[in-house]
Structures are given as C-alpha cells and as structure tokens.
Swiss-Prot record:
<keyword id="KW-0862">Zinc</keyword>
<feature type="binding site">
    <location>
        <position position="493"/>
    </location>
    <ligand>
        <name>ATP</name>
    </ligand>
</feature>
<feature type="binding site">
    <location>
        <position position="823"/>
    </location>
    <ligand>
        <name>Zn(2+)</name>
    </ligand>
</feature>
<dbReference type="InterPro" id="IPR011116">
    <property type="entry name" value="SecA_Wing/Scaffold"/>
</dbReference>
<keyword id="KW-0811">Translocation</keyword>
<keyword id="KW-0963">Cytoplasm</keyword>
<feature type="compositionally biased region" description="Basic residues">
    <location>
        <begin position="827"/>
        <end position="839"/>
    </location>
</feature>
<dbReference type="InterPro" id="IPR036266">
    <property type="entry name" value="SecA_Wing/Scaffold_sf"/>
</dbReference>
<feature type="compositionally biased region" description="Polar residues">
    <location>
        <begin position="791"/>
        <end position="809"/>
    </location>
</feature>
<dbReference type="GO" id="GO:0008564">
    <property type="term" value="F:protein-exporting ATPase activity"/>
</dbReference>
<dbReference type="Pfam" id="PF07517">
    <property type="entry name" value="SecA_DEAD"/>
</dbReference>
<comment type="subunit">
    <text>Monomer and homodimer. Part of the essential Sec protein translocation apparatus which comprises SecA, SecYEG and auxiliary proteins SecDF. Other proteins may also be involved.</text>
</comment>
<dbReference type="InterPro" id="IPR000185">
    <property type="entry name" value="SecA"/>
</dbReference>
<keyword id="KW-0547">Nucleotide-binding</keyword>
<feature type="binding site">
    <location>
        <position position="832"/>
    </location>
    <ligand>
        <name>Zn(2+)</name>
    </ligand>
</feature>
<feature type="binding site">
    <location>
        <begin position="103"/>
        <end position="107"/>
    </location>
    <ligand>
        <name>ATP</name>
    </ligand>
</feature>
<dbReference type="GO" id="GO:0005829">
    <property type="term" value="C:cytosol"/>
</dbReference>
Length: 839
C-alpha cells in the first residue's frame, strides 16, 4: 500500500514539474505583452485565429495566448494570474481537472483555457451550477473576453429559442448544466433546422465539476409531457370502434400475431371518425390507436396473455412460466388499449419524450474539463467514466487553517447543545462562524436553538441563489453567524472582514459528517482561503445517520468500555476519525457502484439515441430528395413481410402476403393470390417492390414541386420516428424496472436489459419503416397537405385526430359513384371525395 501511495505522489510531482515548465514559458512573455499598446494586445486575437487557420495547434499557441489573457486581465480587472493559476489553466486545456483550493482564483484561472479554445471558433461552454454564477462570471470575466474581441453569451432558461441561438453562436457561452442538457434534448425534437439552438458540442469547462458530474450523475434530464385525458379518450373511442367490426373488417396474420383493417374496415373507420382518408399523414396518431385496439381485442387473450387483478390492474402473463409479471406493462400503447378493452382505469402516465444523464451528456463534448477544490477522493470515477485526470495544484500561499479533531457525543441533543455553546463562545469574542449542515431540517433546528440563545444569524438553504451569494459574501465579517446546507453559497468566496484575522479567522462548524469525504472537505475549505487563518470543527453523535448505518457498534463498544455513557460525554480520538473515514469510504463505494450501474443502463439508450438523433438530424438538414431513404424502407418492409411467412404453409403464406400488400402497400384490386402463386420469395419481393415504386411515384406527382416533395418526405418520416421513439423510451423504462427484479433470480439485469433493449430497438426500426411505408402508400396527398403537416409537426404531438380533408368536391370532375376517385387514392368515388355528395 505504501508503495502505491508513494508512486501516486511521485506521479503528481512529475506532472507538476511539467506544468511548471510550461507556466514559466508563459511568464517569459509577460514583459513583451506589457509593452504592447491596448490596440496591439487586442489585435493578438485575430493573429492567433489566423495562425490557427494556417495549421498551428492550440498547444503551440498556448504560451503566448495565456500571456495575452494575463495582461488583459491586469488591464481590465486589475488581476494578474499567479503561476499556480497558469498551471491550473494548462490542466484545464488538457481536458483534466485541476484541484484548486477555495479562494485560489478558479474563475480567473478559467479565462486562459477558455480564451485559447475560443480561438478555434467552434464554441466554448462554461458550465456553472446555477444561473446566478453564470450571470456573475459572464459579466465579470466577459469584460476580459470582450476587450480581446471575443463574443460572450449567457444562456438562461427564460430566454426564447432565438435568444438561446444567439448565445450559443457566441465564441464563449455561459450556461447551467441542466439548461445545456435540456437544450440538447429539445434540439433533437424540432422538425426544422432553423429551430435548433446549439452548435456541435466542442469544449465544455465545468465549474464545481464534482457537483455536476458526480453528485448529479444519478439524476437524468427528462423532457416529458403528461398524457392528456383526451389521449385516454382516444384509447376508449378506438376500442369502441373496433368492437363494432365483424370478421370481414380486419385480417389477422396468425404466425406473426399482426392484424390490420381490410378495405371494408378502413371504410368503417373513415365513417366512424368522420375522415376522408384514414391514412393521411395527419392521422398517423389515430391509426396507432386503432392498431393497438385491434391487437387488444382480437389478438391479446384474457387469462392467456394477461389477467385482470382484483383491483382492476392489467397484469402480463409470462408465456414461459405462466406467472404474472409484476411491474411490467406492454409497450407502445398496447397496455392502455387493453385497459380500455377491459373497461378498467387507463393509467395516466407522463410520457418521456427524451432523456439523457449528465454522464452521457458531457461525454459527447469533443473536450471536457472541470474545476473544483475537492475531487481527489473521486479520482477513479473521473478517470473511468470521463477519462479525466485529477491534478492537485499547490496553493499560492501555505494553508494556515487549523482542522480540529472530531468530537463525538452520545445523542443528537447533547451534540446540538455543544454546537450552540461553541457558537455562543466564539460569537462573544466576535469571531465569524459558518455552521454547515447536511439537511434543511437540521439548519432549521440549529436556527431555532440560536434564536433561543439570543444569537443573531442568517440561514441559507440553497433556495435563493442570488440572495444567498450576498449573505455568504458577508459571512466573514466580525460577529457574523451563518447557517448553511452543504451546497448553499458554493462558488462564492468568503472574504474576512477587518480585524477578523486577529480573532482566528472564519470558524467552520460541521454538525455531522456527510456520506462523502469530498463534501466535508468542501465545508472545511470555506475557511482559510489564500493563506488566511481559520478553524474547522466537526461535531458528531452516535445517532447521526452515517454513524447509525456504519461503524457505530465498535464506537459504542469503545464507549461502554470507557463507561462514558452520560448525556454530555464527549470523546475525542484518532480511532474515531479512522472509523468515520472507513464508513465514508464504504458509502462512497456504494454510491459509485450505483452511478456506474446508471451509466451501464443509459449506455444502452445512448447508442440507440445517437442512431435515432443522427438519422433525425440528417433528415432535418437534408436539402435533397429523401426518396432513396424512403424506397429503402419500403423494400425492407416488403422483405420482412415475405420472410415472416417463409416457413408457413405455402397457400397460407401467399394469402398473408396478399393481405399485407392490400392493407399496407397497393390498391386492393391491384394484387391477387393467383398472380403470386408459383413465384419464389425473391420474385414476390421484387414484384411487390416494383408495384410499390409505381404507387410511390404516383403519390409524389400530386405535389407541385421538388420543395413540396422534400417537405412532405421530412414531415412523414419525423412524425413517425418521434412517435415510435417516445413509445420506445417508455418501453425501455418499463423494461429496466422489470429486469431489476430478475437480479433475484441470479440473472445479470444489465446483460438482460442490453439484450432485450437491442431486440426492442430492432422491432422499433421495423415499426417505423412499416408505418412510413403504409402512410406513404395509402395517404391521400394534395397540395394543402404540405402546409398542414408542416404546421402540425411543430407542435409537441399531433392533435387534429378528427380534422376533415378540406378538398372541395365542387372542384372535381363529374364522376360516377362506383368509379375510381380522381384524387388518386385508389378508392371508389363514393367512399372518398364523393362521400358527402352521396350521403
């Protein structure tokens, strides 16, 4: 163990020697930069950009660029970065994490790598934990960047898409971690390229990186919308409709357990829902409801595929074991359709439209770096998950803070009495005190006790970032007493007031140990900034959460041996510190394992999300005919339909293929079983494909120009992809909950999730291509379709399920009722645009 520790220390020292060598080179330019006029110094930015364009790397530009920023900061802000800050800046540029103590000037340190990377012109994102810090840092440090000719933007949640786009197009963009993540998700939900706000993700520099990438790693960002009561009504209406059908109105393919409406069923659907054409692009959502209602009523069997529990819940039956599968729901809306069929309550759920974890969000940047004062304890996680090293940077001045040994009390009450007594004693002499708690409830409890003791104080609990920053700035003044939860005021320095140094500086009192050593170190680090004097003291009790869960038995036994069980007994021992640290390491290990598992699950979705988003972005940005892509989908859909019956009885197979072709591909009278008999599967595929191509060309000929064709193709694909992807995310969530239970059966849930998730993804791709094919082949296209569909696609979900076609029958030529409708739908005039005339 000692050898490993020695090796780590030597590696750190070697890294620091390299950094110091580069830092000295930066410092060697100081006199040269100081001699330049403001105009010449500002002109360096354009010079660097030109040199970069000609082939110089950012690493080659680093010494001069850092020197320019140092001189600019001195002229604009009156601040001149120290050598240790230069070293920290180099670490950031390398895509690592410099561990810099509180008060060592991390914000100023960041200006150098931010400026250097902005020269590339691909955008730099400076990420903070709240909007107060984004606004503050962008305003203060933005003066330096603006002076040097770079543009600076602030991305706030309240900004409009146009304002966000402007902020992201700046050389440097300040934003919170959550807003960057949500903007990424929203960008992958729009249907027009001009509605996107972000550029490709280039370089992110994350302030308080441990908070963002470690503490919040388990919480995914989710864009969701509540499923409306109107949606539930559509499940019920679709169910009522399919219950009116007879066996001639639908066709079941037994081997594949699929079902579709026959021509008579389509006619009934159009009549029931008052539509001119069921397969118009505007009715994609409705056809989805009808498909599910058909499956629920005529494919899914009560007491075989599912059961209804006594409390009215639909439970899936495992086909292999015959047992019900608790917690599982059929995906893609089928479960709700069965609930409608059985007349039980349709469970309203918020539907996730998009989600991502911070882990996978920030791993998408070409380069990622971060700053914090406390990260060394999480070094393994940073290295394994983010490929980032933790480089401890020496302080500019030696640390003068005194860290006292922990004090342990038998009960919470005796501990809090001791805390109040300590505060009272220190307050009497004017020493400022920061009392740190792990929960808002504890803050309120301490506050009440201080009120009873007559001690004036401020309470912070991370609710108002702007107000708390002002309070925390004054926490170092003589006589100040401040109570704060762990994260409150983080990012704001506590500067000592006049005469406070002589009183011992700021005293930090911890009311219990946090699960993470890193959080405790952050609290300690609020005191003793830049060589200031200070103190820290932690108060513990056997009733603290950490002590109850880990290690308290040994300490209790120690107390029993010492016969120190009185209420106000206190113990102070090195053994106590070792026990607490051991408990914290165990909790940290458990939390790391949890975060690692979250990442393993999200990696499955990440791969699928990247495929969907990349294809989606390709569609949005395309200025070309998407015909080749759609034709490929049609070809694969036909191939799947034919292959699904390869092992069936030949007559049954031909009948099923004809049914597929008639319901999803071509007009009913244009294909028959007779012409397909005697053909091999490959010949059938080719014949159906050529027929489909003819229909495809016929469909697009109804649009006036190439622009209209491209717009129609885009909307067709995007509406179906978004609908299926949303359903797929929901299905993956349900799968994840279900496979977690399988861990009890000695199965690896992550492996099962990966295998089943991949199969579900393949099924979703097939469903997308089938819906695109069916809608393309069966949609009644007219010129107004383009505008209507485009407008609809900009909303979160298609709403106009019951809208009618606006074609005017007066404009059509005189047609007999049983003749083909001139609109090109392939239907009889009486069942299409002639319906109103003959009703």
């Amino acid at each position: 163990m000692a050898n490993i520790l020695r090796k780590v220390i030597e590696n750190d020292k070697g890294e620091l020697r390299k950094l110091e060598k580069i830092a000295k080179k930066v410092e060697s330019y100081a006199d040269q930069m100081a001699s330049l006029s403001d105009r010449d110094l500002q002109g360096k930015t354009l010079e660097f950009k030109e040199r970069y364009q000609k082939g110089e790397t950012l690493e080659q530009l680093l010494p001069e660029a850092f020197a320019v920023v140092r001189e600019a900061a001195k002229r604009v802000l009156g601040l001149f970065p120290y050598r240790v800050q230069i070293m920290g800046g180099i670490v950031l540029h390398n895509g690592d994490v410099p561990e810099m103590r509180t008060g060592e000037g991390k914000t100023l340190t960041a200006t150098m790598p931010v400026y250097l990377n902005a020269i590339a012109g691909e955008g730099v994102h400076v990420i903070t934990v709240n909007e107060y810090l984004s606004t503050r840092d962008a305003t203060e440090m933005g003066e330096v960047y603006s002076w040097l000719g770079l543009s600076v933007g602030i991305n706030l949640a309240a900004k409009s898409p146009a304002e966000k786009r402007e902020a992201y197009n700046c050389d440097i963009t300040y934003s919170t971690n959550s807003e960057v993540g949500f903007d990424y998700l929203r960008d992958n939900m729009v249907v027009r390229q001009e509605d996107m706000v972000q550029r490709p993700l280039n370089f992110a520099l994350v302030d308080e990186v441990d908070s963002v990438l470690i503490d919040e790693a388990r919480t995914p960002l989710i864009v969701s919308g509540a499923v409306s009561s109107e949606t539930n009504q559509l499940y019920i209406r679709a169910d009522m409709f399919v219950k009116t059908l007879t066996s001639v109105d639908y066709v079941i393919d037994v081997p594949t357990k699929t079902i579709g409406l026959s021509d008579s069923g389509i006619d009934k659907a159009e009549s029931y829902f008052n539509l001119s054409n069921l397969y118009d692009i505007e009715n994609v959502a409705l056809t989805h409801f009808i498909d599910n209602a058909l499956r629920a009523n005529y494919i899914m069997l009560l007491d075989i595929d599912y059961v209804v529990s006594e409390d009215g819940e639909i439970l899936i039956v495992d086909q292999f074991t015959g047992r019900t599968m608790e917690g599982r729901r059929f995906s893609d809306g089928l479960h709700q359709a069965i609930e409608a069929k059985e007349g039980v309550r349709i469970q309203e759920e918020s539907k996730t439209s998009a989600s991502i974890t911070y882990q996978n969000m920030f791993r998408m940047y070409k380069k990622l770096a971060g700053m914090t004062g406390t990260a060394k304890t999480e070094e393994e996680e940073f290295r394994e998950v983010y490929n980032m090293r933790i480089i401890p940077i020496p302080t500019n001045r030696p640390i003068a803070r005194i860290d006292h040994t922990d004090l342990l009390y038998p009960t919470l009450e005796s501990k809090f009495r001791a805390v109040v007594e300590d505060v009272k004693t220190r307050h009497a002499k004017g020493q400022p005190i920061l009392v740190g708690t792990v929960a808002v409830e504890t803050s309120d409890l301490i506050s009440r006790k201080l009120v009873e003791a007559g001690i004036p104080h401020e309470v912070l609990n991370a609710k108002n970032h702007f107000k708390e920053a002002q309070i925390i700035m004054n926490a170092g003044q003589r006589g100040a007493v401040t109570i704060a939860t762990n994260m409150a005021g983080r990012g704001t320095d506590i500067k000592l007031g006049e005469g406070v140094r002589e009183l011992g500086g700021l005293c930090v009192i911890g009311t219990e140990r946090h699960e993470s050593r890193r959080i405790d170190n952050q609290l300690r680090g609020r005191s003793g900034r830049q060589g200031d004097p200070g103190e820290s003291q932690f108060y513990l009790s056997l009733e603290d959460d950490l002590m109850r869960r880990f290690g308290s038995d040994r300490i209790k036994a120690f107390l029993d041996r010492m016969k120190l069980d009185e209420e106000d007994t206190v113990i102070k021992s090195g053994m106590l510190g070792r026990q607490v640290e051991s408990a914290q390491k165990r909790v940290e290990g458990n939390n790391y394992d949890t975060r690692k598992q979250v990442l393993q699950y999200d990696d499955v979705m990440r791969e699928q999300r990247e495929i969907i988003y990349a294809n989606r972005r390709d569609v949005i940005t395309a200025n070309r005919d998407l015909g080749p892509e759609i034709k490929a989908m049609i070809k694969r859909t036909i191939d799947r339909a034919v292959d699904a019956h390869a092992r069936s009885n030949r007559k049954d197979a031909i009948d099923a293929i004809v049914t597929f072709a008639r319901t999803s591909l071509v007009p009913e009278e244009s294909v028959s079983a007779k012409e397909l008999r005697g053909l091999k599967d490959d010949q059938i595929k080719e014949k159906l494909y050529q027929r489909a191509l003819a229909i495809y060309d016929q469909q697009l000929s109804k649009l006036r120009d190439q622009e209209a064709i491209i717009e129609f193709q885009k909307v067709l694909i995007l509406m179906i992809v978004d609908n299926k992807w949303t359903e797929h995310i929901d299905a993956l969530d349900q799968l994840r909950n279900a496979v977690g239970l399988r861990g009890y059966a000695q199965n690896n849930p992550v492996v099962e999730y990966q295998a089943e998730g991949f199969k579900m993804f393949q099924d979703m791709i097939g469903a997308i291509e089938f819906d695109v094919t069916r809608t393309m082949m069966k949609a009644q296209i007219h010129e107004q379709e383009r505008e209507r569909a485009s407008q609809r696609a900009t909303t979160a979900a298609p709403q106009n399920i019951q809208s009618q076609q606006s074609a005017n029958t007066d404009d059509l030529p005189k047609v007999e009722r049983n003749e083909a409708c001139p609109c090109g739908s392939g239907k009889k005039f009486k069942n299409c645009h002639g319906r109103k005339s003959f009703s």
